[in-house]
C-alpha cells in the first residue's frame, strides 16, 4: 500500500510540474524545436540560457532579433544557426525574441 501511495504522489508531482512548465509557442515548435529547447541545450543553446545572457542588457530584444535574422554562432560555440532558422517571418522572429527574453 505504501508503494502505491508513493507512486501516485510522484506521478501527481510530475503531472503538476509539467502543467506549470512554460510551453514553447507554436511557431517555435514548428521552426526552432529541432535545434532549441526551453530548458535544455539541443544543437543550439537552451532559451533560458539565452535569456540569462541578455538579461538587463540595453537593446537585448533588438540584438536577439538581429541574431535570429542573420544566423551565426553568437559566441555559444555550439555550431552555426542558419539565417531565420527554418524560414521564420519578421513578425514571428520579434515575437520569439520577446518570448525568449521573458524566460527565467
PLM regions: where:
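N-terminal export/targeting leaders of redox proteins
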Residues: 1-23, 104
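Electrostatic cytochrome c docking/interface patches
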Residues: 15-28, 53-57
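Hydrophobic alpha-helical segments typical of transmembrane helices
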Residues: 22-23, 31, 46, 64, ...
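Stable alpha-helical elements in mature extracytoplasmic
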Residues: 23, 60, 64, 89-96
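The canonical Cys-X-X-Cys-His
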Residues: 31-38, 96
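Protein kinase-like catalytic domain
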Residues: 36, 69, 101-104
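Axial heme c-ligation environment in periplasmic c-type cytochrome domains
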Residues: 42-54, 70-95
Amino acid at each position: 500500500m505504501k508503494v502505491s501511495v508513493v507512486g501516485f504522489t510522484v506521478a501527481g508531482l510530475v503531472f503538476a510540474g509539467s502543467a506549470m512548465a512554460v510551453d514553447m509557442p507554436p511557431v517555435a515548435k514548428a521552426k526552432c524545436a529541432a535545434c532549441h529547447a526551453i530548458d535544455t541545450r539541443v544543437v543550439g543553446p537552451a532559451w533560458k540560457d539565452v535569456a540569462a545572457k541578455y538579461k538587463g542588457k540595453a537593446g537585448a530584444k533588438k540584438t536577439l532579433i538581429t541574431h535570429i535574422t542573420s544566423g551565426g554562432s553568437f559566441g555559444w560555440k555550439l555550431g552555426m544557426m542558419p539565417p531565420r532558422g527554418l524560414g521564420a517571418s519578421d513578425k514571428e522572429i520579434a515575437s520569439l525574441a520577446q518570448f525568449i527574453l521573458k524566460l527565467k
